[in-house]
């Protein structure tokens, strides 16, 4: 997040990261014809326009950790709400896109934390060989509401007949978006997974964890295994995946291999390099964003783009929670 031009990589590429960290985004559009594509594209464009150096400087220059987190929460929440409003307005202007909407999940990795903001049922997970597997987001869905109310056992939620019914999204003209936010302290060898319900709606968390655990040293294979797992059980929805590997500093001496280049560690940064494996749907613009390299940056990110599996869309309903 260091320059004004945003790019999508076409081949394996090492991205240096500056003081603004890196941003991971998944937006899973919904609606008839191409309306879902339009909604997710608007959401991504809104996020892109929000993450400018001028706006980010006001946050990253804060020295108080509590003030920084509060500022980031406000910033991400406002960005998601702005995307919601832009989608609603676009729907009013073009009748062919009425009813369009999108989920969104954002992970902003900055300094020694990940800041997560989401609306809908696209998820953010983190895996660490030492600390295990954790879902960092919480679905905005009818089934999750039943679990929260004690009306449904968590182990029965996955197979519930209404597990695709969401209660929040971007683009609903009758209900303004209400995103949630949380932060997470980074650990060495954390692997982040952002995904649409095309993966987590078909594969149990335990299966996702097992695939990441077995392939944590080769996330390209990991990506393939996750997609294959979703397809093996039906694959009725688009599968969008973002994988991000956090690597702690190993040495101050640069290595010869560009893919493993190590830069000197900033004094206030524990984690020196982030390896990003971004697997998204470029056509829908719903998977990920990151900025053009800044050569003077202290961190590096390794990008491995790939195709996202596209299947025939199924309807995703949006409702307000109702008593059971």
Listing of model-derived features with the role each one plays in the protein:
Residues 1-324:
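PP2C/PPM-type serine/threonine phosphatase catalytic domain
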């Amino acid at each position: 997040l260091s320059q004004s031009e945003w790019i999508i990589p076409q081949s394996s590429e090492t991205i240096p990261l500056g003081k603004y960290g890196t941003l991971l985004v998944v937006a899973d559009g919904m609606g008839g014809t191409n309306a879902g594509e339009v909604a997710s594209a608007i959401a991504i464009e809104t996020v892109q326009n929000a993450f400018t150096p001028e706006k980010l400087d006001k946050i990253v220059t804060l020295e108080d950790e509590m003030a920084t987190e509060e500022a980031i929460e406000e910033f991400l929440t406002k960005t998601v709400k702005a995307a919601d409003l832009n989608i609603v307005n676009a729907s009013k202007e073009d009748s062919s896109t009425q009813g369009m909407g999108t989920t969104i999940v954002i992970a902003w990795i900055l300094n020694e934390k990940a800041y997560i903001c989401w609306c809908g049922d696209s998820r953010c997970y983190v895996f660490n060989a030492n600390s295990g597997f954790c879902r960092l987001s919480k679905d905005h869905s009818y089934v999750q509401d039943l679990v929260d109310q004690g009306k449904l056992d968590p182990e029965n939620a996955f197979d519930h007949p209404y597990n695709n019914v969401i209660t929040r999204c971007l683009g609903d003209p009758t209900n303004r978006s209400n995103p949630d936010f949380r932060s997470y302290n980074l650990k060495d060898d954390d692997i982040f997974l952002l995904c649409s319900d095309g993966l987590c709606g078909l594969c149990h968390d335990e299966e996702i964890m097992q695939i990441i655990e077995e392939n944590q040293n080769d996330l390209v294979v990991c990506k393939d295994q996750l997609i294959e797992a979703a397809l093996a059980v039906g694959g009725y929805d688009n599968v969008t995946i973002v994988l991000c590997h956090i690597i702690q500093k190993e040495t101050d001496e640069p290595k010869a291999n560009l893919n493993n280049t190590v830069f000197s560690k900033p004094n206030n940064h524990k984690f020196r390099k982030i390896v990003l494996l971004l697997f998204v749907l470029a056509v829908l613009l719903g998977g990920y964003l990151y900025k053009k390299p800044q050569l003077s940056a202290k961190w590096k990110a390794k990008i491995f783009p790939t195709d996202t599996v596209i299947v025939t869309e199924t309807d995703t309903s949006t409702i307000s929670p109702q008593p059971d």
